Amino acid sequence: MSRAVAGPEIERLIQLLGRLPGLGPRSARRATLHLIKKRETLMAPLGLALQDVLGKIVECQVCGNVDVRDPCTVCTDIHRDSSVLVVVAEVADLWALERANAINAKYHVLGGVLSPLDGVGPDDLNLTKLVERVGAGGVNEVILALGATVDAQTTAHYVTDLLRETGVKVTRLAHGVPVGGELDHLDEGTLSAAIRARTAL
């Protein structure tokens, strides 16, 4: 066990930062030292921003996104194509698609994927509201952007069956060669998916 090198307040900050995704103990220490070094220009504004947003965060009752308003910024954007609904597993997926600026549609966050091994069943996901949104009319296409894992694909098939009676067009993201990727560096599953999802030029 390593000895403490700073007071309990700093050690607590290190431990809390270490709980963030992608930050282990070493990275948390480096981040803490960086915050301390930049305490006037980074740490203080970060602390204020965290305090400001803490009491305002809400889950959008329409799509499941997180924001400081409900309905969220995405749902209230009148410039979006509300006839297209992109279904994602997590809020992080919604944000990733928005960063890519790939589509100007509305979203629906399931809150995970079906995973029998982890005890996640249909009742644990935001599926009822999805069926209600599609059933209310106005949605012409549902794009399943759920990833390529076995659980994600199982979820995609389940959602497709669930929406079959609505008559809505259901599509999913193509899987395959990433932009800038070289074929000899890809696994067989990715190559097979790329061949199956090929398009005409």
Swiss-Prot record:
Gene designation per UniProt: recR
Mapped zinc finger ranges (C4-type): 60-75
PROSITE patterns to which the protein is assigned, alphabetical: RECR, TOPRIM
UniProt family annotation: Belongs to the RecR family.
Record keyword Zinc-finger present: yes
Keywords recorded for this protein, A-Z: DNA damage, DNA recombination, DNA repair, Metal-binding, Zinc, Zinc-finger
Domain Toprim: 83-178
Protein name in the entry: Recombination protein RecR
CDD domains: TOPRIM_recR (cd01025)
Domain of life: Bacteria
GO MF annotations, alphabetized: DNA binding; zinc ion binding
GO BP annotations, alphabetical order: DNA recombination; DNA repair
Organism annotation: Azorhizobium caulinodans (strain ATCC 43989 / DSM 5975 / JCM 20966 / LMG 6465 / NBRC 14845 / NCIMB 13405 / ORS 571)
Biological role: May play a role in DNA repair. It seems to be involved in an RecBC-independent recombinational process of DNA repair. It may act with RecF and RecO.
